[in-house]
Amino acid sequence: MSDKFKLLLKQIHFPQHEEAYNEIKSGSIESVKLFKSKRQWFFVFSFRNLLSYETFTLFDNLLHSSFDSLGAKVSYMINVEDISCDQSLLEAYFSYALDILKSSHFSIYSLFSNLGIEISNNSISVKAPAHILRENLHERFIALIADVLSNVGLSNVSISVLEDKEASSSLEEAYETNKISLQEEAESQARQALQSIVQSSPVPPPQKHQAQNFAEKQSQRVASFDKAEITPMIEVNSEENRIVFEGYIFDVEQRETKTGRIIINFKVTDYTSSFAMQRWVKDSEELVKFGMIKKGNWVRVRGRIENNPFTHSLTMNVQDIKEISHTPRKDLMPEGQKRVEFHAHTNMSTMDAIPTVEELIDTAAFWGHPAVAITDHANVQSFPHGYHKAKKAGIKAIFGLEANLVEDKVPIVYNSENLELKEATYVVFDVETTGLSAVHNDLIQIAASKMHKGNIVEQFDEFIDPGYPLSAFTTELTGITDNHVKGAKPLVQVLQEFQEFCKGAVLVAHNATFDVGFMNANYERHQLPTISQPVIDTLEFARNLYPEYKRHGLGPLTKRFGVALDHHHMANYDAEATGRLLFIFIKDVFEKHGLTNLEQLNTELVSDDSYKKSRVKHATLYVQNQTGLKNLFKLVSLSNVSYFEGVARIPRKVLDEYREGIIVGSACADGEVFDTLLSHGIDKAVEVAKYYDFIEVMPPAIYAPLIAKDLIKDEGAIEQLIKDLIEVANRLDKPVLATGNVHYINPEDAIYREIIVRALGQGAMINRPIGKGENAQPAPLPEAHFRTTNEMLDEFAFLGKDLAYEIVVANTQAMANQIEEVEVVKKDLYTPYIDRAEEQVAEMTYAKAFELYGNPLPDIIDLRIEKELSSILGNGFAVIYLASQMLVNRSNERGYLVGSRGSVGSSFVATMIGITEVNPMPPHYLCPKCQHSEFITDGSYGSGFDLPDKECSECGTEYKKDGQDIPFETFLGFDGDKVPDIDLNFSGDDQPSAHLDVRDIFGEQYAFRAGTVGTVADRTAYGFVKGYERDYNKFYRDAEVDRLAMGVAGVKRNTGQHPGGIVVIPNYMDVYDFTPVQYPADDVTAAWQTTHFNFHDIDENVLKLDILGHDDPTMIRKLQDLSGIDPKDIRADDPDVMKLFSGTEVLGVTPEQIGTSTGVLGIPEFGTNFVRGMVEETHPTTFAELLQLSGLSHGTDVWLGNAQDLIKEGIATLKTVIGCRDDIMVYLMHAGLDPKMAFTIMERVRKGMWLKISEEERNGYIQAMRENNVPDWYIESCGKIKYMFPKAHAAAYVMMALRVAYFKVHHPIYYYCAYFSIRAKAFELKTMSAGLDAVKARMEDIKEKRQRNEATNLENDLFTTLEIVNEMLERGFTFGQLDLYKSQATEFLIEGDTLIPPFIALEGLGENVAKQLVAAREEGEFLSKTELRKRGGLSSTLVERLDEMGILGNMPEDNQLSLFDDFF
């Protein structure tokens, strides 16, 4: 505690005997200000940890009351070192913030008290109706609350606002209903008034002309609508009547209100802005009239613009609407004279481009282009979709990428000689220029220091008049003004004098390529010899000598080494500072590496990974043939795996090695040909261009940002550069291709790229600000839309008609013709080779079948095996089965069960070889002694587990029962040729070992994690738009924000990996035959490489194993370890276990005690609120009915609005409704339908296609079902289903669930120990160990919060835990306290009928700290709290919490031995 803070506590009478004093005494006063005139004090306090709320309020009250008593005011701000905050503490501080703002902003308090607030993980989420959210909360209140929280130390808390859609909808309907009723009332009153007037007035004489009829009026109205003036949306900023818009519908939502009215909300854009629109329809008949309101249509609309009170934005209430035609851009050139785009990006160019590859190819095909190239930045992730789309569209896709080309090694010394570093004389120089181009910009200062042995022996400093006024940017950057250069020596004289000054010396510059390049360009221009003596680049010297430094610029280096740099960017100061650094480097390179000679710097200091710091240059690479495709895949892989540094880099030597089959283009303004031309002129550019197969030129508009960057003077200079590029190509007889650098399709799409790019922040090179201060802005982005041939010819019209046609059309077509069609995605499945895989699968299958069912096999078994093996072996699937079997077997040997997912349990072969426990045969009896069996094939039982117990008719042994009646067709299709997708649930604890098993079985070079591509999500896109709006002073109405967010969403943002998917490449091929590889999320330290392609793009070509982690196998293993009971011995038809699904008696409690009428709390598959409700409605009594429930709960539109209603109305029972997908096929075959038709109906229904297929096809199925007496309710039920769960998946899950349930009934303490150790997500030890009353009270508290929509996610998780805690306590078991010497790190401990919680259950104590604490106590007893903190790794807050809970007993703060710690 600082003395000042100690004095303050004393003055405000802070009680020193309170526990709060021990917490607050770590504080200090950082600063204090006194405003005497106002008698106001302002403190800045600092604390190590966030104060507990009790301590904070005590301090706050005493501070204010003390100053109030002196007639003074006090305010303060708190800084906290460790801002770790638990749930309850954050809630307390949030309430404090509301109370603070209550007096000055009462509306905040009243508003927040009626809104849903969720608090968790240092974040606060406010749920509010849309009309409050957009204006009041976000703009006014959130910032105020954040300020209060920041002042008390919670500067890291994020506050977000989420729309409460249910509340928004209710309010909006109420508003509209009220508005309609008011309108109807007004109309009624008007009619009554009119009728009264008519009745009281004399009847007028008949008119000579006839009154217009309704049809005439309507036609006039339509005519006026058709001829009405169209208003641009951007011009409408207030309420107006009878406005007419034309635009594109980009979003439609339709819903029916409680009163039966239909509201159509849709959004329209004319690309100047967007509007939300609304049309109310009285019923479904009227709805037909508005069929044109569909996403993608162009419409003309007329209506009234009103301010919507819910969204607080202008909305059009539509009166008239009609669909209109819209003519998209077309390519106007004749057939055969259309260009090929060779430089186009898709949304797979990370955070840089907008169109999907499908949109790009569709546009090219629509325009009649013969081909189009894909050149995303450094990746080929759009290739698979582009390949399939091009085939479908009938257009050639040219596959390429825009690579980041780097030099292999960047030298430190140019023109090196054999010189001793310490003996040489150096001229350390720097130049200042009007820009970065040695061709287009001028020298304005040359300064140098001649140095020998660390001393300056002579200096050179001359300004140069460029002959024109310096730009404000140049002056701002360099500090050089027109007055500096006015009257300076002529350039040629300065150059000559400088050459004389440099004679006999080694030249030195920081980033020497720039300075030397500028000097040589000017020497050449004036016929002077170019630099030939050695040149040291101190930038590269520093990069190689100090690779651990992140920054090697002149500023950071001078600061690090304490070298003065008073005026950075004035040449004389920069040169002297560079010289001082040089001699530090010479000293360090000798001390670190023993290097003394100039030549050694390149040969011994330049590292092999100097490419990491090398400047990246773009080059476009194109696949010319199949060899080129594989080589490109290798290059992409190497750039991501071996040469990744910030971006994926390709060293030139690597490109040379794999260049076969690849065409190399010179790329854009970031390519080295363009850069050399700009910086050094045509001659040097010709030398560089020799490396490339063709030269790219782009429309002048693409290069326009270079003007803003002061790299090029004007548009005329751009046109000259393009002509110079053509000259470079002509000298080398290389073709010139005009390319568009496409980043979006249409000109109006530019805003989408603008938003995406600006979201990268100023740290991104493309967003580097031009200028300084408030006016600094990034350079504008180029106009990079996809241009038609005629648009491209217009861009290059300045070259003349013939030359423009040559580079735009003729050369691009000729280059496209040189490129062969390639196969990007293979047609077939290529599985790995395992010796004798087919024989092994067949042998294992029959061996197990003989063991269980006897030899010879029953016909039904024999035929099923023969059928399955014919498919599995005939289609090359044996290796997939065998690999899965090997993985499952290895996990079993480690002591874990493995659960199957999906439909693999439909395969009897999979059952026999041990991949799945699910037996798909019809229900049957099986004798474990003599192998006799009896099969029930009439459909009377849905599961063999439900068969009544029975003794073997042959030997009298009690039969085993099995069989779930699942057809094989549901796994591999009716013809058995569908690639098997075997998903397996391994224990989460064993999952890493299972992953490594794949490597072990197939080889590390053949096993890769399944890659994923992360794109900009909808909510993120919305945030990008709002951020752009804020940062660039824009204003968009809500509909326009939504439109822009939709345009931005879907752009690639990062890469990742599937949580359990592993792709296996066949060992007779290599991975580059299918995909490049990389590390997930560009993390080169990751343990696994991933497929570069999204794994879904190649999942039909290679084996993919889903090795997922799951809690069920972990929990089963825990229960087995606790009890010694083999889970495989647990019967699936235990009568006591089945009682859980119909009541609570088997647990020894009443429904009132545990708050639910069944005993399924905490049982996998059945313990959620939703499924518990289903259980309570249906009371299942058989395994088959549990399968039904599992299917019903996982399906979409299978239970709600479907089976639930059928059961309630008594039309069907739980047993007869459609539950799992396989049941449809089995039921229909039992009914008499042809198996093929039964299978097809099942497939149509399970995928939600029943109502989407043609009416003719559907009626054929209905007729067949009715002919076989399938009831109408069953047929109608099929039509409602959107998705169905596989029965095999349900069976695997239910079998696991019943094993867990067995322990809950028969070995409850083991069950609760396992549940809390593995499944529980949240704990509150104080409540859990305080007894039943405390638990029930806390549950009631959370229930009330839930009703007010105020319960946090953590509280919702805690409620689930407390339900099980309550049940456990009601059954007579208890929770003990944490015990410093008994508690485990992560798992609960059984002590009689009591569970001792682990350390991890203590709020704020993580797994690593818990393990450290357990390890520390093994070393010896903790003698003091200080020792506990140090050895156990606990924070002061955690130690205090343990102390408050009574866990530390009378442990002293310090022990005597600790007094001597500081001496060691």
Swiss-Prot record:
UniProt keyword list: Cytoplasm, DNA replication, DNA-directed DNA polymerase, Exonuclease, Hydrolase, Nuclease, Nucleotidyltransferase, Transferase
Q: Where in the cell is it found?
A: Cytoplasm
Q: Which reaction does it catalyse?
A: DNA(n) + a 2'-deoxyribonucleoside 5'-triphosphate = DNA(n+1) + diphosphate
- Organism's domain of life? Bacteria
Q: Which InterPro entries match?
A: DNA_pol3_alpha_NTPase_dom, DNA_pol3_finger, DNA_PolC-like_N_II, DNA_PolC-type_N_I, DnaE2/DnaE/PolC, DNAPol_HHH, DnaQ, Exonuclease_RNaseT/DNA_pol3
Q: What is its EC number?
A: 2.7.7.7
| MF terms in GO | 3'-5' exonuclease activity; DNA binding; DNA-directed DNA polymerase activity
Any GO BP annotation: DNA-templated DNA replication
One Pfam family, short name please? HHH_6
Residues in domain Exonuclease? 426-582
Q: Where are the transmembrane segments?
A: none
Keyword Cell inner membrane assigned: no
Q: Name one GO cellular component term.
A: cytoplasm
Give the family from UniProt: Belongs to the DNA polymerase type-C family. PolC subfamily.
Name the job this protein performs.
Answer: Required for replicative DNA synthesis. This DNA polymerase also exhibits 3' to 5' exonuclease activity.
What name is this protein filed under?
Answer: DNA polymerase III PolC-type
- Source organism: Streptococcus thermophilus (strain ATCC BAA-491 / LMD-9)
Q: What's the gene?
A: polC
